[in-house]
């Protein structure tokens, strides 16, 4: 679907549907007043009958109003002035899109520029609107024998004032790239694990490198992983017929003298728990355990599409965690790339085992900041639910930048503590560190484990176990998060 930005009066455009706002108390927005005057008070007459109160979520479709080039006018309730938050605004936009899809028209014009969203300027409001529209077009029916019919809606025009047109266009460009990145992430996450395995993800990286010539891609196989001394990473994949892969993608859009930013993604393409086997109920959703790697793919795609003037390295630690005669066992001790030894007390705490070696590997790029992204702990879902990603790290400035980016992108994170006292839970009598820290503070102790491998890095950890996918029901599937947060962080660094 194409998004177009124009600065014209709404009545001048020929369109299948013109969308205008009505506030609570039947207050007409600026565009609605123009349409009302041209149509001889047609909207006012409808509102006087009580057909629409202007509350959030209400809408009313009018046909063939006089003196208009639009075939239909869709009145949309937007609530009280200056009380509209991000979530209600997104719901309004999603409702508009669903209505437009059902009408069958090929285009629509949205005259909603006068809507006030709390703490949002013209750019921020348009970002939310455009991202919701493009992301709302997402479908995943690759494996359905009967595909959904192609949608008639091909173009939506966003109207704004002349003075804001450049800023609104910038917001649309950013939102479109982010939504495209989210779609890439969602597609990878929704694929079945018999197709989306570590080798497949390596192929996707190479395909991305072919599409974007300024991307350098290297895929390291199991022999290279072993030769690098990544004993922890290698141990996770050794029980599977699908060999592990370390995927390294480098984009150099900034100056050669500038240190890169690094994104490190957990890519467990299916997690049975290994010998520490998970319960069978809901295990199908463990295909989403590569959500961290998928979100790095999506963020990188957005960066490439926007050609951001930054240097970025993306490292994906991809493996399949399976039980077998060759799988690692509880009690095994492995040596990491850093030289530290780890006692594997639970093979289902495997994400940290692949990430620790990937984080050590990232040091060779001398990054100015490293962010790892992982569906790491069920404890994070208990603590924060499905709305907020967990955030921990060793650099206060980096943490604040990520919190700010999450707020700006409406893709929030929340900081959890990383106090030294928690480190004691990882003590092992036989190795330098144990891979689990007991039942308490599971999200924190998982990050404590990773912190042992990031002492030379400005590092942050995003636990997206609750936000990477939606469980069960008709809305089941990958969400595309935290692509908006990560892309916003990089936009801020690029000052784009």
UniProtKB/Swiss-Prot annotation:
GO terms for cellular component: cytoplasm. Its EC number is 3.4.11.1, 3.4.11.10. It comes from the Bacteria. Mn(2+) 2 binds at residues 266, 271, 289, 350. It is an enzyme of class 3 (hydrolase). Disulfide bonds: none annotated. Its main location: cytoplasm. Its cofactor is Mn(2+). This is Probable cytosol aminopeptidase. It comes from Pseudomonas fluorescens (strain Pf0-1). The lineage of its organism: Bacteria, Pseudomonadati, Pseudomonadota, Gammaproteobacteria, Pseudomonadales. The gene is pepA.
